[in-house]
Amino acid sequence: MKEPLIEISALNRIFQAGEQQVAVLKDIDLKIYPGEMVAIMGTSGSGKSTLMNILGCLDRPSSGSYRISGRETRELDDNELAALRRNHFGFIFQRYHLLSHLDALGNAELAAVYAGVSKSSRRERAHMLLSRLGLEERCEHKPSQLSGGQQQRVSIARALMNGGEVILADEPTGALDTRSGQEVMAVLRELHQQGHTVIIVTHDPLVAAKAERIIEIQDGEIIADRVNPASELETSASSATDAASAAGRKETRGAWLGRFSEAFKMAWVAMTSHRLRTLLTMLGIIIGITAVVSIVAIGEGAKQKVISDINSIGVNTIEIFPGKDWGDERAAAIDTLVAADVEALQAQPFVDSVTPSIVNSQQLRYRNVAVNVNINAVGEQFFRVKGLVVAEGRPLLREDIRTQAQVVVIDSNTRGKLFAAEDDPIGKVILIGASPWTVIGVAEDKSDMFGGGGNLSVWMPYSSATTRLIGRQNFSSIIVRTPDGLSSAVAEQGIIRLLTVRHGVKDFFTFSTDSILKAVEKTTTTLTLLVSSIAVISLIVGGIGVMNIMLVSVTERTREIGIRMAVGARQSDILQQFLIEAVMVCLIGGGIGILLSFGVGALFSLLVQDMQMSFSVTAIVSAVVCSSLIGVLFGFLPARNAARLDPIEALARE
């Protein structure tokens, strides 16, 4: 004896309506055998559609048993039920339920996407099915370009895509004219003859009369189950085998890639169909990413500018001062920094060059011009230590130090005050205090962060200054330049050890540009983090905007979600689709934000001449990662809501 394909016993379906329970199906017992063409007939509200939903695994019974090929559906989880819908059932709906943004081919092959069939195979089969149904010339037409009968035939092709072992037709002719209805019924009869099990749900006795078996349902109970003697249908056993084999096809290895591609395509279509809304959704992300990347670039540019300015006062330099630290009241009485210390330091391997320094202020006169200048009594290596370039004439030489020559190098500011642009200052004699001094060179102006660019400076041999102007032999400080590549900390420790031994006591302290650099880097990093944290708030607000719009999108596309679930989409497929959409919105918004930040950088360079924004790959990659994370975090809730939708309720939405 043939085993039933579908077996229902003592099945009940009860819905909660407020505080009351409504029994829609009551103790249903039913067996349907492979290859049968069955009509379930009843008036509106009789429970026939609810029964069809349970048969198609779109709904679960409240109690009782429902077996498919001997398998109890009550024990199956959501993904296993989706597999049954995908591999065994094909739905034909009264309102067609085609996706408006897909053409006939795309709608027909939808079930195969979730079954993991390769793109080429599903395209070939979809084209074959549509051609068999008389739609060969309409494959690339959207639903809005098809008649009702043509749309219904597309839905039949979709139902057959994965084999369609069981065809569930809900009022298949209800929205069609007489001729189209007859054509659809002819197709269903043909499918039955090919071996498909066809179950038609209808209120129309004329439609039911086309089936070989008629089941009447009223008030949730089966009141009649009879063979239709008027039916003269025959079933092709060979075709039934073909249908079953088609339904049992396994997923290809690249199935996940096909589903991902479909999800990506659907996300893109959803975004482009609401361009303004998508742009407004991106706006918060765009502003946030632009702000973060720009602020980090400004911070990095500012740090580089400050470092450059620090380097302008001496590259890799360590200064030695008398006393224990800044503000030491006894420092003025300490006179141990002398020329012998300079000579000793010069001989050390951790010293590139060294110069003493005594700073004083004097009045300088040339002809009828008198100005106050900073007098810098230094050694011959001063210009190397400080990285200054003598543009005219020559720098100080060791011979000048030895002979206590009354020569000076002036800066470009002093040159501008004393001499006309066309005059040659080299060899001119100026008065500093009451002593005559000969100008031997002009140093290039090297403005720095400490505002030295506007001062007037003069450099002279320390040996001459101590005897003719200052009247003391000890130095205000000694400045050491360390070799490139040598750690300042190593050199600093060597200097401290050497001078402590020479003086017998540590009566000095050191100050290096390295400590300034570290302080600057720490400060700029702190400020960048502070301002970036404010910009991140914009990103969070943008993420909330993405979540809100995605929730709206889920509501708008509820029917689409129901259709996808009906053809076999898993909850994970729906979750993936909406997550991809959220991530795409955020990634594109992040990309636009990065491009805008480059625009901000170009504008910044026009407005601020002495500083450039510095864009780093790390900041840009971080922005992209941040955009993706926002998409995942704020897109998860809407995506989860979409995946948890009840397919029956989703299909009922308009």
From Swiss-Prot:
Listed transmembrane segments: 279-299, 534-554, 584-604, 617-637
Compartment list: Cell inner membrane
GO terms of biological process kind: response to antibiotic
Molecular function terms from GO: ATP binding; ATP hydrolysis activity; transmembrane transporter activity
Domain ABC transporter: 6-244
Record's keyword terms, sorted: Antibiotic resistance, ATP-binding, Cell inner membrane, Cell membrane, Membrane, Nucleotide-binding, Translocase, Transmembrane, Transmembrane helix, Transport
Top EC group: translocase
Subunit organization: Homodimer. Part of the tripartite efflux system MacAB-TolC, which is composed of an inner membrane transporter, MacB, a periplasmic membrane fusion protein, MacA, and an outer membrane component, TolC. The complex forms a large protein conduit and can translocate molecules across both the inner and outer membranes. Interacts with MacA.
Task of the protein: Part of the tripartite efflux system MacAB-TolC. MacB is a non-canonical ABC transporter that contains transmembrane domains (TMD), which form a pore in the inner membrane, and an ATP-binding domain (NBD), which is responsible for energy generation. Confers resistance against macrolides.
Name of this protein: Macrolide export ATP-binding/permease protein MacB
Source species of the chain: Hahella chejuensis (strain KCTC 2396)
Lineage: Bacteria, Pseudomonadati, Pseudomonadota, Gammaproteobacteria, Oceanospirillales
